[in-house]
Amino acid sequence: MTAMRRGGALLMALWTIAVLSVMVLSFAYEAHQQSGINVYVRERNRVNRFTEAGQAIAEVILLNYSSVADWTEDQDTEKLLEDDRWICEKQSLKMYANCTVGPLVLDEEHPESGTVTVEIQTANAGSQGIININQLYSGGGDGKYMERWWMLFKAYNIPEELSTPTDGTINLWNILIASWDDWRDEDDTVTAIDGDETGAEAAWYEEYEEQEKIDEEDRRRPRNGPIPDVHELAYLRGWRDYPQVLCGGVINPWEKPEDQITVKKPGIEHLFTTVGTKKIDINNCHSLDALVTVPGVYENPEDNDALDEALGVAQAILDALKVKPDYAVDETRDWWPFKDWNDLTERVEEDVGSDAGQYFAYKPDDSTVFKVKITGESMGMTHEVNAECYVKNGKVRYIRWRED
């Protein structure tokens, strides 16, 4: 019995040791996990503080960029920097409609702690989010808004007429334009183009949603005003039926491969924004597809070669920005903005029609909406903020603020 008891005691001791070992390992694992969580939280808080600092820097630049002196060839930049840390960025924003700060080390004693980068440009610029769609309708004061749609559709290979298995041959362009008009305008009259009611008001959507048994939370009615988000286009008549218009891809997959039509990716949605004016920041526009929609860049949109000719003019505009003009400029740059319409027409080798003048902006003004991108980085972690804002009465007012 004594031996059996000793054996049982030994087994119990071994079992207890095993349990304790598991508990110790568990505690160690939890401590390690907690340590990892603490590091994550600490670094996340750090990059959050970096983006907050970036916001402060952006606002300092935005609030008085317009009051600084223009860059001159003989300016004493070092002396100016002694008086204003951000003078170069302010001059850049004033003269070139964009500026970049950083990557900037905020803690000089611990440079490895991370950086912040601030990028500012006008809203109607860049390679996407250029055309304010809220201005591109019958009530937007643009007598050539339909022509601009036609050129946009041509640029993305969106067919004017489309043979469908359910509705026969439809005029897709008219449906897209008219349904957007009805969604955007303030009346309840169905828009007709060439005598056909190709638009859609509330009654059309009600009938469609009942027929398709659309869930209540997904039902929509015309906004009868400006839209806040370009993704809203996906709810419109025609646009919802042919999402390839927005995102690219084969628009008629029911056809034989040789008869299929591919809308150029990524589709037209990425060109749109919902803020700003009808003017494009010509000095910072990097999209040929946006430029070909400008009257004066294109001539007659109904010509078969209208798109090719417009692309040639648009490319000539972008090329001219990279050629140093024959007046005093900052030669450290690799591109030089157009000062105004006269400067543009003198520097661009192709003929640009006079109509284009009313669609181009050259510098920010009181009506300008800005895009601000703030990126904080620390220990491999990144926090990005994308905002849209404007300056009014001495304050930066935010229209949209998105964080990753």
Positions of the model-derived regions?
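Compositionally biased linear targeting/interaction segments
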Residues: 2, 8-18, 22-404
